[in-house]
């Protein structure tokens, strides 16, 4: 990656100031001591990766931040050494198994809450991967592995990312589904969550914003295999074209600073038994757009058609390599 202009580089002092101001604007807690530990432990990842802000529309929810890593690193081991994560956490073996796939090539990134520290470990698998590979690693409990048939039955056969939530002991599995997404397929995927079907205008808005071949994240309880939530994403939505969002998200998108050459705003519509909410992410430093482009993510206004996915789906393959 070429050197960034100084105003686009990650600066720890500026980040602390921006973190406090953004958290105050949305009513989120900050724990400076934990923030300092995070920034020191992962100083190279923040310096060389892309950093972004995250939050949800839920009142009082955390202001979170993530680095998308350009470095191949055991972020879990580093977090354990720094006291940010318990090395005996039962989810650690799952991350280890996923990280060992495909010759050990998956790249780990990490999410942190401003008030609590380590939140998630996030893995990019290097492209389209068979869901069977991801959901059959030995560390995954049998009830989670048993969910594979439910996803394949909906045509969700390929995964690009996964994340573990350390506090909730859950995992998000990010599928790329062949679209275009319509109301019938939306309803089938939504039904996995057991939530109340959303209003027709909400569904219409989701369908209008997701790319043709869409990204849906499915949240699984890592003990029971229960599906807690489903979330549909729209990436790099311009400010002047953003969908209706709750007031807390609108405030977040207005006040969270971005020093990237191109702003990258992400909207996620999350549905589940416990209620629905909106997620938002916003680029900060390190050129988030560049990283997501390199990972073949689709942005608002693009065709959003994955020709490799379509070739795999058309042949009925669930064992294709990375694309």
From Swiss-Prot:
CDD domains: PT-CloQ_NphB. InterPro entries: Aro_prenylTrfase, Prenyltransferase_CloQ, PrenylTrfase-like_sf. SUPFAM superfamilies: Prenyltransferase-like. GO terms for molecular function: prenyltransferase activity; transferase activity, transferring alkyl or aryl (other than methyl) groups. Pathway: Antibiotic biosynthesis; novobiocin biosynthesis. Optimum temperature is between 30 and 40 degrees Celsius. It holds the Pfam family PTase_Orf2. It is found in: Cytoplasm. It is an enzyme of class 2 (transferase). GO terms for biological process: novobiocin biosynthetic process. Substrate binds at residues 160, 281. Its EC number is 2.5.1.111. One of its GO terms (cellular component) is cytoplasm. Optimum pH is 7. It comes from the Bacteria. Keywords: Antibiotic biosynthesis, Cytoplasm, Prenyltransferase, Transferase. It catalyses: 3-(4-hydroxyphenyl)pyruvate + dimethylallyl diphosphate = 3-dimethylallyl-4-hydroxyphenylpyruvate + diphosphate. Monomer. Belongs to the aromatic prenyltransferase family. Magnesium-independent aromatic prenyltransferase that catalyzes the irreversible transfer of a dimethylallyl group to 4-hydroxyphenylpyruvate to produce the ring A structure in the novobiocin biosynthesis pathway. Novobiocin is an aminocoumarin family antibiotic that targets bacterial DNA gyrases. It is able to prenylate many different compounds, including the phenylpropanoids 4-coumarate and caffeate, the plant polyketide resveratrol, the (iso)flavonoid naringenin, apigenin, daidzein and genistein, and the dihydroxynaphthalenes 1,6-DHN and 2,7-DHN. This is 4-hydroxyphenylpyruvate 3-dimethylallyltransferase. It comes from Streptomyces niveus (Streptomyces spheroides).
């Amino acid at each position: 990656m070429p050197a960034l202009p100084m105003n686009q580089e990650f600066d720890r002092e500026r980040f602390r100031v921006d973190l406090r101001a953004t958290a105050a604007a949305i009513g989120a807690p900050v724990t400076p001591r934990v923030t300092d530990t995070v920034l020191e432990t992962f100083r190279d990842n923040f310096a060389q990766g892309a950093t972004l802000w995250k939050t949800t529309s839920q009142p009082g929810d955390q202001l979170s931040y993530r680095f998308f890593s350009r470095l191949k690193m055991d972020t879990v081991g580093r977090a354990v050494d720094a006291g940010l994560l318990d090395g005996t956490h039962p989810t650690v073996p799952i991350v280890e198994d996923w990280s060992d796939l495909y010759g050990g090539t998956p790249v780990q990134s990490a999410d942190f809450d401003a008030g609590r520290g380590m939140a998630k470990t996030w893995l990019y698998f290097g492209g389209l991967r068979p869901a069977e590979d991801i959901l059959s690693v030995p560390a995954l409990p049998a009830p989670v592995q048993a969910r594979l048939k439910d996803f394949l039955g909906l045509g969700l056969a390929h995964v690009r990312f996964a994340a573990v939530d350390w506090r909730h002991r859950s995992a998000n599995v990010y599928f790329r589904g062949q679209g275009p997404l319509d109301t019938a397929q939306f309803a089938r995927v939504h039904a996995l969550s057991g939530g109340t079907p959303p209003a027709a205008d909400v569904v219409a808005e989701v369908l209008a914003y997701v790319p043709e071949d869409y990204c849906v994240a499915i949240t699984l309880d890592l003990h029971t295999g229960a599906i807690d939530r489903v979330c549909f994403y729209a990436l790099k939505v311009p400010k002047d074209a953003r969908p209706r969002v709750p007031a807390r998200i609108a405030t977040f998108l207005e006040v969270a600073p971005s020093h990237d050459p191109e702003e990258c705003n992400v909207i996620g519509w999350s549905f589940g038994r416990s209620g629905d909410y909106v997620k938002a992410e916003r680029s900060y430093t390190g050129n988030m757009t560049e990283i997501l482009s390199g990972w073949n993510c689709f942005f608002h206004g693009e065709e959003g058609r994955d020709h490799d996915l379509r070739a795999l789906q058309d042949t009925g393959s669930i064992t294709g390599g990375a694309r």
